Swiss-Prot record:
HAMAP family: LpxD
One matching Pfam family: LpxD
Record: active site: 248 (proton acceptor)
Organism (species): Synechococcus sp. (strain WH7803)
Protein name: UDP-3-O-acylglucosamine N-acyltransferase
Amino acid sequence: MRFSQLIAVLKNGDAGVLSTSEGRDPELRGAASLERATADQLSFLEKGNALVGSLESSEAGAVLIPDQQELRELAERLQLAWAVCGDPRLAFAEALEQLHPKPSPQAGIHASAVIADRVQLGAGVSIGARVCIGDDTRIGPRTVIHPGVVIYGNVDIGEGCELHANAVLHPGSRIGDRCVVHSNAVVGSEGFGFVPTAKGWRKMPQTGLVVLEDGVEVGCGSTIDRPSVGETRIGSGTKIDNLVQIGHGVVTGRGCALASQVGIAGGAQLGHGVILAGQVGVANRAVIGDRAIASSKSGIHGEVAAGEVVSGYPAIPNRLWLRCSAAFSKLPEMAKQLRELKKQVSSEATGGSIEADQ
């Protein structure tokens, strides 16, 4: 694809192409970082990026840059094809879709797939090898189901979804449109519900639903449990990384982002646009407000206000946590000073002095 052809596509996208170079139109066969890009590859640079210096040594054939005069002048001096974008990272994402288009599996059903009698398949559905689908399941148009996927009975899947190899959907799973479930993810498994009795733990039947609203993406090896009653609901546009555990009855708002190894206990509620970094733990029935952010390994109990940034265990406001972290390394010296002060106070209380004792 020529650079000019790519820019013509990007101008219709969301990244905002503001201006482009003239007279240079390389053939692009891929994309790479500034350090690794070659003459037939595209790269990009963000505003304030620490890699600004690497642009000068880059061998990229074309580059997407922020609206900074010095970068335009540098790209011109290096004789690079360039485009100024309102959001270079977003433009790069849109460019990757053009340079590396996803293959479209052919519609149809593989001969080795096992499909129950009471299954409704929409137009253009693609079902791969050794897929198993139970009764009372509906699959919307243009959904792609890769090899080894298991879909229990009583599952509803919208249109344009993609289920990757070996994903599992349990009964009561309700999947919206354009959702992606990656390999080995499990949606709708039984929640961790047991009642203590004199004879031991009594299992609580988990009869509820799991609802993934439109545009949800679930990473590899992640699990979303169904509750005993009611539903576990993941808001539209939410992105879930690999190895995330979401307990029974959890509700998230729209557009949340949950990084790897996040664990959310049953009944917790997340507002819209919440971001949980890696290994964040959320306690049972905790409430997190809209647009709140928790940094890596935070432990959340109780309530986090809308827009708040928290860190640490137990989670506290991020700025306070930074001050505490800075003080932590000074604790040994502070303890030593405290011991010396205690000696001094004790000596003065008995009428002596440290100098005299020495």
